[in-house]
Swiss-Prot record:
Full protein name: Translation initiation factor IF-2
Gene behind this protein: infB
Source organism per UniProt: Neisseria meningitidis serogroup A / serotype 4A (strain DSM 15465 / Z2491)
CDD domains: IF2_eIF5B (cd01887), IF2_mtIF2_II (cd03702), mtIF2_IVc (cd03692)
One Pfam family cited in the UniProt record for this chain: EF-G_D2
Renumbered residue ranges of the record's region G5: 607-609
Region spans: Disordered: 101-366
Length: 962
């Protein structure tokens, strides 16, 4: 495509054919019509001519500088005068930001402005943009001239790309003007489309054809300099670039046309909205000020003929009217302030008033938009802590507190604005009001614990396994453990049953094993769950002569929930009734399959009494431990779990701690739940004082501030201040959560109990030696409650019975249960004086049975009918003023005067009532036995007939039991 016609080249450059022919003639190329062909040499001659005509002269450029003032009024820094023009050139970034701000803040043109004013405003804006572009071009020309002095050959040699892209540079707008037009295309479309991007490759001093030097007559064209012929590859590349440039121009023209149409529609809609707003404002103004004509808002209001107007008042009204039209105080602002509030729309006129220093005529910037409040609802993401007040919740959702209270009342909660609600209720309220509720992250001191755990890294070493012995009551768990320990623990337990979690560690030839002995009674479910939580391996003890029992099934469930492996010890195989195969079958039904049957559970037949296969059981436990590869860091702060806790009168709070990792030392600062303190003493399970304990070793510790809850995690902290802070925070958090839930529960109970008779309540105060015992006892007693009699555990705690417990019993009418504890002398004396009953127990069965008997005594007795005799009516005697008298024969039993009677006719009960009189002959008698005749009357009933039978019975009360 080396030869093209003049018409094609003109179409490619988007220039008229006549202008291109004229420039070709000036360059020395003789072409007469648009159909003449153009060669590459012709194009290069034209390029050389235009470069010389519009390019640099090689000398210095002098720029006349005039001093003037620039007024800045929240827009582009430009002031136009009649004779001279001074331009303050911002940077490209500032220019783009200012143009964007001017477009977004411009107020729409008032409807009464003519089309000529709008065109004049657009022309003025285009002139300002052109002036900025020319100034930038002059600065760039000066800079390029300096660079040209240093390297003239490079400046004078035009690039080959300019030959096709810049033949008409004298009439081409600078690139900066194109950028300004593109930025203003949304609000102020340009008359000319943007030039191709290839023109931006030209130096600024070559593109600027509208500078001061361009006004001078052009010099005659220099003779053409012969240029080397380009290769075919370069020509193909140029053709491809030209094609892309043409496609880009077409795309830009389409975009510009679309923007112009969109702008026209927007202008029409704005004008229509302005007219409607203006009409509404004029109607409103007409109602407020009838003395002012609505047709001429600029003129002063004339006086009404039938009503005199005060001159001062009229003057003030006139000034207000001028202010409404933007010609009052706002028009005379000094120093560019333009009045008190230029940025706010006044009386619905969305115009921005611009003032000048000398109070010149106003300039109204069109397309300025006033602020509009958001109409769409705002959805907040609300983080809800454990407890939150109603006021804080409303603040987080940015709504009024009344709305939150209203929503809670709809849910049935009568709350005040300062009342606390729990997290679950708050999340429901947040969702109800259309926001997104999420539980808040732990923004509390406990986050310090996680950071500290990550910071400490120590080498993990092998540790002993923790083995929990579980099973049904009386299946021989503790006896099995006794044989392993060679001790007699069962004899020390009351009733021969375990009522505490015992923690022991045993040294075997193959290593150390830590055992946890859990109670098998159903009341100690929580203890068994804690034992399974802290364990590595579970030994499930099943009696060979008893089989699978309820607590055996529960122990299997705990082990599966904790995800720990099991070893089944089939105990009591030395008994005659032992049947180990039946045990295997029953356990298989509960998904505990022996390994010899293809399962993964080891079954060992043992006898705790004779010591059979005990070594095989330990071997199986250690084999499971090897498979688990149990490790824990040793040289690190200790972490563990509270297995049991109690309050000792002489030593204070005593807790049994199973160390799970690290080394616990005497004097460490320990945090366990809401309790903390420095360890003052440590003893092992044999009562021997020790100074440190490693992983998987159980110890008793002294020195905590309070009795911790069994099952709490414990860890050593380096700072007592931090431990105190975390413990106090937990206490407050638990208290708030508990109170919030109690309040909700009270309201629920109030509605549930509405309309029901009040049930009797048996109040109990429980004091036990360890926490696990009073937990089990309180849970068992609450299970005894019925609809008629309820057990109310007012208080339960660890330690001996004190005077405060007795005083609480006096105030509430409760009795006190002491489980393995006693009352001191002062408490006993106070209880005797106030008739407070204190009962001591050391076996949980006895306590449950006595409470059950007391509850049975509180039940209302049951009424039963007891038949005493049968009577046959043989004659009916009617006596006036008395009624019908039945002459009867007692056929069975005895008839008493105060008995109840049931009238039976044809084996159908006709009436049930009482006897009013009983006589034998004429004498009143108390009773008549079988075989004797008597006369009787039924109270309030006379419809008796011969042949009827009377069944006499008494109502007796029978005591009920639970």
């Amino acid at each position: 495509m080396s030869n093209t016609t003049v018409e094609q080249f003109a179409a490619e450059l988007k220039r008229p054919v006549e202008d291109l022919l004229k420039q070709l003639k000036e360059a020395g190329v003789s072409k007469n019509s648009g159909s003449d062909s153009l060669t590459l040499d012709d194009k290069q001659l034209l390029n050389a001519y235009l470069t010389k005509k519009n390019g640099s002269n090689g000398g210095t450029i002098s720029i006349r500088r005039t001093k003037t003032e620039v007024s800045t009024v929240d827009g582009v820094k430009v002031e136009t005068r009649k004779r001279g023009r001074t331009v303050n050139i911002p940077s490209a970034e500032e220019l783009a930001a200012q143009v964007k701000a001017a477009q977004t803040q411009a107020a729409p043109v008032r409807p009464e402005q003519t089309a000529e004013d709008a065109a004049k405003a657009r022309a003025e804006a285009a002139t300002r943009a052109e002036a900025r572009a020319k100034a930038e071009a002059e600065a760039a020309k000066l800079k390029a001239a300096k660079a040209g002095n240093k390297a003239k050959p490079a400046a004078q040699k035009p690039t080959e790309a300019k030959a096709e892209t810049a033949p008409v540079a004298a009439e081409t707008k600078p690139a900066e003007e194109s950028k300004a037009e593109k930025a203003q295309a949304d609000k102020m479309p340009s008359k000319k489309p943007a030039e191709p991007k290839e023109k931006a490759a030209k130096p600024k001093h070559e593109r600027n054809g509208k500078g001061k030097d361009a006004k001078k007559p052009a010099k005659p064209a220099a003779p053409a300099v012969p240029q080397p012929v380009v290769s075919a590859e370069e020509q193909a590349q140029r053709d491809e670039e030209a094609r892309r440039a043409a496609a880009l121009r077409a795309h830009q023209e389409a975009l510009l046309k679309e923007k112009q149409e969109r702008q026209a529609r927007r202008e029409a809609m704005k004008q229509q909205a302005e007219q409607q707003a203006k009409a509404a404002q004029e109607a409103k103004t007409g109602r407020q000020r009838p003395a002012k004509p609505a047709e001429k808002p600029q003129a002063a209001a004339p006086a009404v003929e039938n009503k005199p107007v005060n001159p001062a008042k009229a003057k003030k009204e006139n000034r207000r009217n001028r202010d409404d039209e933007g010609q009052g105080r706002n028009a005379k602002g000094k120093g560019g302030k333009g009045g008190r509030d230029r940025n706010n729309a006044r009386n619905g006129d969305d115009e921005r008033v611009r003032g000048s220093k000398k109070g010149k005529k106003l300039k109204l910037e069109p397309n300025q938009h006033a602020f509009q409040a958001p109409t769409e609802p705002v959805v907040h993401e609300v983080l809800v802590p454990e407890t939150i007040t109603v006021a804080d919740l409303a603040h987080k959702m940015a709504v009024k507190g009344v709305e939150v209270v209203k929503a809670l009342m709809k849910m049935g909660m009568m709350v005040t604005i300062n009342q606390s609600i729990d997290q679950d209720t708050a999340l429901i309220v947040v969702e109800e009001l259309g926001h997104i509720g999420k539980p808040a992250a732990a923004d509390d001191p406990e986050a310090f614990l996680d950071e500290g755990a990550e910071a400490v890294e120590a080498e993990a070493l092998p540790r002993p396994p923790v083995v929990t012995v579980m099973g049904h009551v009386d299946h021989g768990k503790t006896s099995l453990l006794d044989y392993i320990r060679r001790a007699k623990v069962v004899q020390g337990e009351a009733g021969g049953i375990t009522q505490h979690i015992g923690a022991y560690h045993v040294k075997t030839p193959r290593g150390v094993i830590t055992f946890l002995d859990t109670p098998g009674h159903e009341a100690f479910t929580a203890m068994r769950a804690r034992g399974a939580k802290a364990t590595d391996i579970v030994i499930l003890v099943v009696a060979a002569d008893d089989g699978v029992m309820p607590q055996t099934i529960e122990a299997i469930a705990h082990a599966k929930a904790a995800g720990v492996p099991m070893v089944v010890a089939v105990n009591k195989i030395d008994k005659e009734a032992a049947n180990p195969e039946r045990i295997r079958q029953e356990l298989t039904a509960h998904e505990v399959v022996p390994d010899e049957w293809g399962g993964d559970v080891q079954f060992i037949d043992v006898s705790a009494k004779k010591g059979l296969n005990i070594d095989a059981l330990l071997e199986a436990v250690l084999l499971e431990a090897e498979v688990l590869e149990l490790t824990a860091p040793v040289d690190a702060p200790a972490k563990g779990i509270i297995v049991e806790a109690r309050l000792d009168k002489g030593r204070g709070a005593v807790a049994t701690l199973l160390v799970q990792s690290g080394t616990l030392k005497k004097g460490d600062m320990l945090l366990a739940g809401t309790a903390f303190g420095k360890i003052r003493a440590m003893v092992d399970e044999n009562g021997k004082a020790i100074n440190e304990a490693g992983p998987s070793i159980p110890v008793e510790i002294l020195g905590l501030s309070d009795v911790p809850n069994a099952g709490e995690d414990a860890m050593v902290l380096a700072d007592e201040k931090k431990a105190r802070e975390i413990a106090l925070f937990r206490q407050g958090k638990y208290r708030d959560v508990r109170l919030a839930k109690q309040q909700a529960a009270k309201l629920e109970n109030m509605f549930n109990n509405m309309g029901e008779t009040q049930a009797q309540s048996l109040s109990v105060i429980i004091k036990a030696d360890v926490q696990g015992s009073y937990e089990a006892l309180a849970g068992s007693l609450k299970k005894l409650s019925t609809d008629e009699v309820k057990v109310d555990v007012l208080h339960s705690g660890v330690g001996g019975i004190t005077e405060s417990d007795v005083n609480l019993a006096i105030a509430s009418g409760a009795f006190i249960i002491g489980f393995n504890v006693r009352a001191d002398a002062s408490s006993r004396k106070l209880a005797e004086n106030e008739n407070v009953e204190i009962r001591y127990y050391n076996i949980i069965y006895d306590a449950i049975d006595d409470v059950k008997a007391a509850m049975s005594g509180m039940l209302s007795p049951e009424e039963k009918e007891q038949v005493t005799g049968t009577v046959e009516i043989r004659q009916v005697i009617s006596v006036s003023k008395v009624g019908n008298i039945a002459g009867c024969m007692v056929t069975d039993g005895v008839v008493k005067r105060d008995s109840h009677a049931r009238l039976i006719r044809n084996n159908v009960v006709i009436h049930t009532g009482e006897l009013s009189s009983l006589k034998r002959y004429k004498d009143d008698v108390k009773e008549v036995r079988m075989g004797f005749e008597c006369g009787l009357m039924i109270k309030g009933y006379n419809e008796i007939m011969e042949g009827d039978q009377l069944e006499c019975f008494d109502i007796v009360e029978v005591a009920r039991t639970l």
